[in-house]
Regions:
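Positively charged
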Residues: 1-175
Length: 175
């Protein structure tokens, strides 16, 4: 599924203040906006570094942690589920264009890492941000969302997803 860097665990960033790292972060933010994405991981631009950028686009707010629509940068992020509850989330990916699939994700996660200034950041999020963080950190671990799917019947083309991949239809068919 694409460039080999997407399937390889990314390397930790040692010097966040390195001009090359700062330039990479700027380029990632620009690429995320150009592609109208909610997040981007460095391996998606063929750089094996543990860096993600993400945001909550308008219309995707699900809970209070989603209210802040500013771009966030996490360097060397670590995620931990804050419980065992999961939910199916419909995901797409800039690295797998044209497809969408229902992926089980933890409903809430703790995160920690560093911002672009090198300051330690940590918190707990749910809703859309929890989903995006799990998706992007998976990229840093060499995991693409279809690899997390438990039922490959729940993946399809963007053009068909609206009609044939609705959660109410899927859950009804499984009952």
């Amino acid at each position: 599924m694409g460039h080999p860097v997407l399937l390889t665990p990314a390397q930790s960033v040692d010097a966040i203040d390195d001009p090359a790292v700062q330039s990479l972060i700027d380029d990632m933010i620009e690429t995320m906006f150009d592609a109208a994405g909610a997040g981007l991981a460095a391996p998606q631009v063929h750089v094996s570094k543990r860096i993600i950028v993400y945001r909550t686009p308008p219309g995707r707010v699900e809970e209070e942690s989603d209210q802040d629509d500013s771009v966030k940068v996490l360097v060397n992020p670590v995620l931990k589920p804050s419980g065992v509850e999961t939910t199916l989330r419909l995901e797409g990916c800039l690295s797998i264009p044209g497809l969408r699939g229902w992926v089980p994700r933890y409903t809430r996660v703790f995160y920690e890492g560093y911002d672009r200034r090198g300051d330690r950041v940590a918190g707990e999020v749910g809703g859309f941000q929890a989903n995006v963080l799990q998706h992007e950190v998976d990229h840093l671990d060499g995991v693409l969302y279809p690899m997390r799917m438990t039922d490959l019947r729940l993946i399809g083309f963007d053009t068909e997803a609206e009609r044939h991949l609705r959660l109410d239809q899927i859950q009804g068919a499984r009952s």
